[in-house]
Swiss-Prot record:
Its EC number is 1.17.8.1. Involved in the biosynthesis of the hopanoid precursor squalene (SQ) from farnesyl diphosphate (FPP). Catalyzes the third (last) step, the reduction of hydroxysqualene (HSQ) to SQ. InterPro entries: Amino_oxidase, FAD/NAD-bd_sf, SQase_HpnE, Zeta_carotene_desat/Oxidored. One of its GO terms (molecular function) is oxidoreductase activity. It catalyses: squalene + FAD + H2O + H(+) = hydroxysqualene + FADH2. The keyword Oxidoreductase applies. Keywords: FAD, Flavoprotein, Oxidoreductase, Plasmid. Pathway: Secondary metabolite biosynthesis; hopanoid biosynthesis. Belongs to the HpnE family. It comes from Sinorhizobium fredii (strain NBRC 101917 / NGR234). This is Hydroxysqualene dehydroxylase. It is an enzyme of class 1 (oxidoreductase).
């Protein structure tokens, strides 16, 4: 008789684990505490703009193979769209200067040898000085590893590392930053084409996974919050949802794919990150100008990245805790001013919405990175998943999928023994 796998949490980590286990033919049961699957990667209808918007502008790169394989498995890889080449346009709104970093289409970072493809006013030596980050340890600081000043840092390195680490780059883990650089910039343009979910995060990465699982007979229960894990002889024996208790057989497996605070509550003594950082996203109902760049890096203002979608302009601001206590009406006017300057547009403030993910990611410092647990727990049949676990990457969608796949592999190994 086939074993069962119970997955707690229907975010990207939980869904990726569920899809992989379903592909292997195992009965899968998914339980989600909220009313919507997707976790921090979801879409919703917003009445203020009268549009369906994402909670965040999650950017995928063509080299994120785990995300792309996951999308392929649920039949939506074509929904991840972007330019055919790895070209990143930027604007400095403090100087009105515009440029484009052209990473080419190969597997090597040969673009650094071509002046026209580099950041303006930078030399080859500036890029070579970044090399130490490639072999830096996770306990080292970015600020002690590479120069955190100068033109290259301000115009390229800082925007990329700020988006990846979601903390002030000099304070971030050089090891985590190095992992990002190795898998993107060092891998050449072939790995760096930016991709976004064309029809929204839920439509591309969440709902198709749920439908696939349900077609295969899996159960996906929403509004089903786990209250307690019961143990017997160092294995999980029962899932306590309050009014509903589910027995876990001796040959079953459980994957805990919930946020770190919930995991620590369910597993007393579990070490998890304790410091988090916010990401602020703003959405405007506004038709982008014809020929607008789908993704534009912005330097010299509050806005960091500007995304152009049909009927909508959207921005992302990382490490956004400094904005949380400022009235939204004040913040949105500063953001809209930056959008107009960066996008070359004008007009009164259109219908808008601001989405603040207060605990968007763990703080990617060496100290917090050291608190990330691996997937194995003290219970033989219980495994952890989540972008906050020890994936070797900062908190990203790629890390989420990797952690889910890793937990699924361990569950498969356990149920096959």
């Amino acid at each position: 008789m086939p074993k069962n796998v119970h997955i707690i949490g229907a975010g990207i980590s939980g869904l990726s684990a569920a899809v992989q286990l379903s592909n292997a033919g195992l009965p899968v049961h998914v339980y989600e505490a909220t009313q919507q699957a997707g976790g921090r990667c979801r879409s919703f209808f917003d009445s203020a703009t009268n549009l369906t918007i994402d909670n965040g502008n999650h950017l995928v790169l063509s080299g994120n193979q785990y995300v792309r394989n996951y999308a392929r498995a649920i039949g939506t890889e074509s929904g991840l769209v972007g330019p055919t080449s790895a070209k990143f346009p930027f604007v400095d709104i403090s100087t009105v200067q515009r440029w484009q970093v052209d990473l080419g289409g190969g597997r090597l970072p040969t673009w650094v040898f071509h002046k026209a493809r580099r950041v303006p006013d930078t030399r080859l030596w500036d890029y070579l000085k970044l090399a130490p980050i490639l072999w830096a340890g996770a306990d080292e600081l970015v600020g002690n590893t590479i120069p955190c000043n100068g033109t290259l840092y301000r115009r390229l390195v800082r925007p990329l590392l700020l988006a990846a680490l979601n903390c002030d780059p000099p304070e971030g883990s050089a090891g985590l930053a190095g992992a990002i650089v190795r898998e993107t910039l060092l891998a050449g343009g072939e790995a760096c084409r930016p991709l976004v979910a064309r029809d929204g995060l839920s439509a591309v990465l969440v709902e198709p996974a749920v439908k696939l699982l349900e077609r295969r007979g899996a159960t996906v229960r929403l509004s089903h919050k786990l209250r307690k894990l019961a143990k017997s002889a160092e294995i999980i024996s029962e899932l306590d949802f309050g009014d509903d208790k589910i027995a876990v057989g001796p040959d079953d497996a459980v994957i805990l794919a919930v946020p770190p605070r919930a995991a620590a509550t369910l597993l007393p003594g579990l070490k998890t990150p304790t410091e988090f950082r916010a990401v602020v996203n703003a959405h405007f109902r506004f038709d982008p100008p014809v020929g607008a760049d789908p993704i534009l890096g912005v330097v010299g203002g509050l806005v960091e990245w500007l995304f152009a979608y049909p009927q909508r302009l959207s921005v992302t601001i990382s490490n956004g805790d400094r904005l949380l206590d400022i009235p939204r009406e004040e913040v949105v006017r500063v953001i809209w001013r930056d959008v107009c300057e960066a996008g070359g547009i004008s007009g009164e403030l259109p219908p808008w919405q601001i989405v603040c993910e207060r605990r968007a990611t763990f703080q990617a410092t060496p100290e917090q990175n050291a608190l990330r647990p691996g997937p194995v727990t003290g219970c033989k049949n219980l495994f952890l998943a989540g972008d906050w676990t020890a994936t070797g990457l900062p908190a990203t969608i790629e890390g989420s999928v990797r952690s889910g796949n890793r937990a699924a592999d361990l569950a498969l190994s356990e149920t096959n023994t």
